[in-house]
Protein backbone atom coordinates (compact mmCIF):
# COMPACT_ATOMS: atom_id res chain seq x y z
CA UNK A 1 0.00 0.00 0.00
CA UNK A 2 1.54 3.38 -1.01
CA UNK A 3 2.41 5.84 1.74
CA UNK A 4 0.42 9.09 1.64
CA UNK A 5 2.44 12.25 1.03
CA UNK A 6 2.21 15.41 3.13
CA UNK A 7 4.42 18.46 3.51
CA UNK A 8 4.92 21.86 5.10
CA UNK A 9 5.55 24.78 2.73
CA UNK A 10 7.36 27.92 3.84
CA UNK A 11 10.29 30.23 3.15
CA UNK A 12 12.54 29.48 4.93
CA UNK A 13 11.35 26.11 6.21
CA UNK A 14 14.41 23.89 6.75
CA UNK A 15 14.19 24.51 10.50
CA UNK A 16 10.56 23.35 10.75
CA UNK A 17 9.64 20.82 13.42
CA UNK A 18 6.45 19.83 11.59
CA UNK A 19 7.98 16.75 9.87
CA UNK A 20 9.12 15.37 13.23
CA UNK A 21 5.78 16.15 14.87
CA UNK A 22 3.73 14.42 12.18
CA UNK A 23 6.09 11.46 12.13
CA UNK A 24 5.46 11.06 15.86
CA UNK A 25 1.71 11.40 15.34
CA UNK A 26 1.86 8.74 12.61
CA UNK A 27 3.70 6.30 14.87
CA UNK A 28 1.29 6.97 17.71
CA UNK A 29 -1.79 6.31 15.56
CA UNK A 30 -0.34 3.59 13.34
CA UNK A 31 -0.79 5.68 10.19
CA UNK A 32 1.96 5.42 7.57
CA UNK A 33 2.82 8.76 6.00
CA UNK A 34 5.62 10.67 4.31
CA UNK A 35 5.86 14.28 5.56
CA UNK A 36 8.58 16.60 4.27
CA UNK A 37 9.51 20.29 4.32
CA UNK A 38 9.37 22.15 0.99
CA UNK A 39 10.97 25.59 0.67
CA UNK A 40 9.02 27.80 -1.71
CA UNK A 41 9.43 31.54 -2.13
CA UNK A 42 6.11 33.38 -2.58
CA UNK A 43 6.55 33.67 -6.34
CA UNK A 44 7.26 29.91 -6.56
CA UNK A 45 4.51 28.68 -4.25
CA UNK A 46 1.77 28.01 -6.80
CA UNK A 47 4.06 25.95 -9.04
CA UNK A 48 5.54 24.07 -6.07
CA UNK A 49 2.08 23.19 -4.79
CA UNK A 50 1.02 21.99 -8.25
CA UNK A 51 4.09 19.73 -8.47
CA UNK A 52 3.35 18.38 -5.01
CA UNK A 53 -0.23 17.55 -6.01
CA UNK A 54 0.95 15.91 -9.25
CA UNK A 55 3.32 13.74 -7.20
CA UNK A 56 0.45 12.49 -5.06
CA UNK A 57 0.36 15.05 -2.27
CA UNK A 58 -2.71 14.58 -0.07
CA UNK A 59 -2.34 17.48 2.33
CA UNK A 60 -0.04 20.30 3.35
CA UNK A 61 0.68 22.75 6.11
CA UNK A 62 1.60 26.29 5.16
CA UNK A 63 3.71 28.67 7.22
CA UNK A 64 5.24 32.12 6.80
CA UNK A 65 5.11 33.91 4.44
CA UNK A 66 2.62 31.85 2.42
CA UNK A 67 -0.58 31.65 4.50
CA UNK A 68 -2.45 34.37 2.65
CA UNK A 69 -1.32 32.98 -0.72
CA UNK A 70 -2.61 29.56 0.35
CA UNK A 71 -5.99 31.12 1.07
CA UNK A 72 -6.08 32.54 -2.46
CA UNK A 73 -5.35 29.09 -3.89
CA UNK A 74 -8.07 27.33 -1.86
CA UNK A 75 -11.09 26.29 -3.90
CA UNK A 76 -13.30 26.06 -0.82
CA UNK A 77 -11.85 27.66 2.32
CA UNK A 78 -13.46 26.88 5.67
CA UNK A 79 -15.41 29.54 7.51
CA UNK A 80 -12.57 30.17 9.96
CA UNK A 81 -10.07 30.41 7.09
CA UNK A 82 -12.37 32.82 5.27
CA UNK A 83 -12.62 35.09 8.30
CA UNK A 84 -8.86 34.94 8.79
CA UNK A 85 -8.06 35.41 5.11
CA UNK A 86 -5.21 32.96 5.74
CA UNK A 87 -4.76 29.20 5.42
CA UNK A 88 -2.29 26.97 7.25
CA UNK A 89 -3.78 23.59 6.28
CA UNK A 90 -4.60 22.29 2.80
CA UNK A 91 -6.54 19.11 2.04
CA UNK A 92 -6.59 17.61 -1.47
CA UNK A 93 -10.11 16.61 -2.47
CA UNK A 94 -11.50 15.89 -5.96
CA UNK A 95 -8.51 17.50 -7.63
CA UNK A 96 -8.77 20.73 -5.65
CA UNK A 97 -7.26 22.19 -2.51
CA UNK A 98 -9.57 22.85 0.42
CA UNK A 99 -8.15 25.36 2.87
CA UNK A 100 -8.53 25.57 6.63
CA UNK A 101 -6.83 27.40 9.47
CA UNK A 102 -6.02 25.46 12.64
CA UNK A 103 -3.78 28.11 14.25
CA UNK A 104 -6.48 29.67 16.39
CA UNK A 105 -7.85 26.35 17.61
CA UNK A 106 -4.30 25.30 18.45
CA UNK A 107 -3.59 28.47 20.41
CA UNK A 108 -6.82 28.38 22.40
CA UNK A 109 -6.40 24.70 23.22
CA UNK A 110 -2.84 25.29 24.42
CA UNK A 111 -3.81 28.25 26.58
CA UNK A 112 -6.94 26.76 28.10
CA UNK A 113 -6.02 23.09 28.47
CA UNK A 114 -2.23 23.05 28.84
CA UNK A 115 -1.84 26.30 30.78
CA UNK A 116 -5.27 26.40 32.43
CA UNK A 117 -6.18 29.94 31.36
CA UNK A 118 -9.79 31.10 31.26
CA UNK A 119 -10.09 33.48 28.31
CA UNK A 120 -13.67 34.49 28.99
CA UNK A 121 -14.08 38.16 29.81
CA UNK A 122 -10.46 38.99 29.04
CA UNK A 123 -9.13 42.09 27.34
CA UNK A 124 -6.60 41.20 24.61
CA UNK A 125 -3.82 43.15 22.90
CA UNK A 126 -2.88 41.60 19.55
CA UNK A 127 0.48 42.75 18.18
CA UNK A 128 0.52 42.24 14.42
CA UNK A 129 -2.07 41.96 11.66
CA UNK A 130 -0.51 39.53 9.19
CA UNK A 131 -1.27 35.88 8.52
CA UNK A 132 -0.37 34.74 12.04
CA UNK A 133 -2.59 37.34 13.69
CA UNK A 134 -5.43 36.64 11.27
CA UNK A 135 -5.21 32.95 12.07
CA UNK A 136 -5.68 33.31 15.82
CA UNK A 137 -7.98 36.33 16.14
CA UNK A 138 -11.29 34.59 15.28
CA UNK A 139 -10.66 31.76 17.75
CA UNK A 140 -9.84 34.20 20.55
CA UNK A 141 -13.15 35.96 19.94
CA UNK A 142 -14.98 32.63 19.96
CA UNK A 143 -13.28 31.79 23.27
CA UNK A 144 -15.20 34.63 24.91
CA UNK A 145 -12.81 37.57 25.22
CA UNK A 146 -14.54 40.91 25.76
CA UNK A 147 -12.28 43.19 23.72
CA UNK A 148 -9.43 42.87 21.23
CA UNK A 149 -7.14 45.78 20.43
CA UNK A 150 -5.06 45.25 17.26
CA UNK A 151 -1.79 47.17 16.88
CA UNK A 152 0.39 46.91 13.78
CA UNK A 153 3.23 48.89 12.21
CA UNK A 154 0.98 49.38 9.19
CA UNK A 155 -2.32 50.80 10.50
CA UNK A 156 -4.04 49.89 7.24
CA UNK A 157 -3.46 46.17 7.85
CA UNK A 158 -4.78 46.47 11.40
CA UNK A 159 -7.89 48.22 10.10
CA UNK A 160 -8.35 45.51 7.45
CA UNK A 161 -8.14 42.75 10.06
CA UNK A 162 -10.68 44.47 12.29
CA UNK A 163 -13.04 44.91 9.34
CA UNK A 164 -12.66 41.23 8.39
CA UNK A 165 -13.52 40.10 11.91
CA UNK A 166 -16.78 42.03 11.68
CA UNK A 167 -17.24 42.82 15.37
CA UNK A 168 -16.75 46.59 15.73
CA UNK A 169 -18.01 46.53 19.29
CA UNK A 170 -15.29 44.11 20.40
CA UNK A 171 -12.39 44.64 17.99
CA UNK A 172 -10.60 47.95 17.43
CA UNK A 173 -7.30 49.03 15.87
CA UNK A 174 -4.87 51.48 17.43
CA UNK A 175 -1.54 53.06 16.48
CA UNK A 176 1.77 51.91 17.94
CA UNK A 177 2.21 55.42 19.30
CA UNK A 178 -0.95 54.96 21.38
CA UNK A 179 0.30 51.97 23.39
CA UNK A 180 0.82 54.02 26.56
CA UNK A 181 -2.80 55.16 26.46
CA UNK A 182 -4.50 51.78 25.98
CA UNK A 183 -4.71 50.67 29.61
CA UNK A 184 -3.90 47.14 30.74
CA UNK A 185 -4.67 43.71 29.30
CA UNK A 186 -5.12 40.18 30.62
CA UNK A 187 -3.65 38.71 27.42
CA UNK A 188 -0.93 40.14 25.16
CA UNK A 189 -0.25 38.14 21.99
CA UNK A 190 2.81 38.74 19.83
CA UNK A 191 1.94 37.70 16.28
CA UNK A 192 4.84 39.59 14.68
CA UNK A 193 8.21 38.42 13.41
CA UNK A 194 10.07 41.19 15.24
CA UNK A 195 11.91 38.67 17.42
CA UNK A 196 13.59 36.98 14.47
CA UNK A 197 16.41 39.53 14.59
CA UNK A 198 16.91 38.63 18.28
CA UNK A 199 16.97 42.33 19.14
CA UNK A 200 16.37 42.74 22.86
CA UNK A 201 14.99 46.22 22.20
CA UNK A 202 12.38 45.05 19.72
CA UNK A 203 9.77 44.86 22.47
CA UNK A 204 10.25 47.98 24.54
CA UNK A 205 6.56 47.96 25.42
CA UNK A 206 5.02 50.13 28.16
CA UNK A 207 4.79 48.43 31.53
CA UNK A 208 1.32 49.90 31.93
CA UNK A 209 -0.02 47.25 29.55
CA UNK A 210 0.40 44.65 32.30
CA UNK A 211 -1.85 43.86 35.25
CA UNK A 212 -1.76 41.13 37.90
CA UNK A 213 -3.38 38.57 35.57
CA UNK A 214 -1.52 39.28 32.33
CA UNK A 215 -0.43 36.34 30.19
CA UNK A 216 2.09 37.27 27.49
CA UNK A 217 2.08 34.83 24.57
CA UNK A 218 4.48 34.72 21.63
CA UNK A 219 3.28 32.72 18.63
CA UNK A 220 6.96 31.99 17.93
CA UNK A 221 9.15 29.79 20.08
CA UNK A 222 12.81 29.18 20.85
CA UNK A 223 15.30 31.88 19.85
CA UNK A 224 12.66 33.89 17.99
CA UNK A 225 10.59 34.27 21.16
CA UNK A 226 13.45 35.27 23.47
CA UNK A 227 13.09 39.05 23.14
CA UNK A 228 9.33 39.17 23.74
CA UNK A 229 9.39 36.68 26.61
CA UNK A 230 12.29 38.59 28.19
CA UNK A 231 10.13 41.72 28.13
CA UNK A 232 7.20 39.75 29.58
CA UNK A 233 9.29 38.56 32.50
CA UNK A 234 10.81 41.98 33.14
CA UNK A 235 7.30 43.44 33.12
CA UNK A 236 6.29 40.80 35.69
CA UNK A 237 3.59 39.23 33.56
CA UNK A 238 1.92 36.40 35.41
CA UNK A 239 2.55 34.03 32.49
CA UNK A 240 5.17 34.10 29.72
CA UNK A 241 4.27 31.49 27.10
CA UNK A 242 5.92 30.69 23.78
CA UNK A 243 4.34 29.15 20.68
CA UNK A 244 5.54 25.58 21.06
CA UNK A 245 2.28 24.32 22.53
CA UNK A 246 0.28 26.08 19.83
CA UNK A 247 2.51 24.49 17.19
CA UNK A 248 1.81 20.99 18.48
CA UNK A 249 -1.92 21.60 18.95
CA UNK A 250 -2.46 23.11 15.51
CA UNK A 251 -0.52 20.20 14.02
CA UNK A 252 -2.85 17.77 15.77
CA UNK A 253 -5.84 19.66 14.34
CA UNK A 254 -4.35 19.36 10.84
CA UNK A 255 -3.61 15.67 11.37
CA UNK A 256 -7.24 15.11 12.35
CA UNK A 257 -8.46 16.84 9.18
CA UNK A 258 -6.30 14.55 7.05
CA UNK A 259 -6.70 11.26 8.90
CA UNK A 260 -9.91 11.48 10.92
CA UNK A 261 -8.23 10.95 14.30
CA UNK A 262 -6.72 13.49 16.70
CA UNK A 263 -3.44 12.27 18.22
CA UNK A 264 -2.39 12.81 21.81
CA UNK A 265 -0.30 15.95 22.03
CA UNK A 266 1.27 15.92 25.50
CA UNK A 267 3.93 13.25 24.72
CA UNK A 268 5.04 15.15 21.61
CA UNK A 269 5.01 18.51 23.41
CA UNK A 270 7.03 17.13 26.31
CA UNK A 271 9.62 15.62 23.97
CA UNK A 272 10.01 18.88 22.05
CA UNK A 273 10.20 20.93 25.23
CA UNK A 274 13.08 18.73 26.32
CA UNK A 275 14.85 19.77 23.09
CA UNK A 276 14.12 23.44 23.78
CA UNK A 277 17.64 24.66 23.02
CA UNK A 278 17.38 23.72 19.34
CA UNK A 279 13.95 25.21 18.61
CA UNK A 280 13.82 28.14 16.23
CA UNK A 281 10.33 29.37 15.24
CA UNK A 282 6.69 28.40 15.27
CA UNK A 283 5.93 26.43 12.11
Curated annotation (Swiss-Prot):
The keyword Oxidoreductase applies. Shikimate binds at residues 16-18, 63, 88, 103. Pathway: Metabolic intermediate biosynthesis; chorismate biosynthesis; chorismate from D-erythrose 4-phosphate and phosphoenolpyruvate: step 4/7. The active site is at 67 (proton acceptor). It catalyses: shikimate + NADP(+) = 3-dehydroshikimate + NADPH + H(+). Keywords: Amino-acid biosynthesis, Aromatic amino acid biosynthesis, NADP, Oxidoreductase. GO terms for cellular component: cytosol. GO terms for biological process: amino acid biosynthetic process; aromatic amino acid family biosynthetic process; chorismate biosynthetic process; shikimate metabolic process. NADP(+) binds at residues 79, 128-132, 223, 243. It holds the Pfam family Shikimate_dh_N. One of its GO terms (molecular function) is NADP binding. Its EC number is 1.1.1.25. NCBIfam families: aroE, PRK00258.1-2. Homodimer. Involved in the biosynthesis of the chorismate, which leads to the biosynthesis of aromatic amino acids. Catalyzes the reversible NADPH linked reduction of 3-dehydroshikimate (DHSA) to yield shikimate (SA). Belongs to the shikimate dehydrogenase family. This is Shikimate dehydrogenase (NADP(+)). It comes from Xanthomonas campestris pv. campestris (strain B100). The gene is aroE.
Amino acid sequence: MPVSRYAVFGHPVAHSLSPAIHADFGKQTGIALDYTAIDAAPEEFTAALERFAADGGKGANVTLPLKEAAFALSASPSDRARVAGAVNTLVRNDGQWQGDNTDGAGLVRDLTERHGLDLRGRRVLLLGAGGAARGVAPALLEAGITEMVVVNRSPERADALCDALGEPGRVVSRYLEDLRELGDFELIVNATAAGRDRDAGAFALPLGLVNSLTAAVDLNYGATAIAFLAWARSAQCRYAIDGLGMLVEQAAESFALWHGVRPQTDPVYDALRARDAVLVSAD
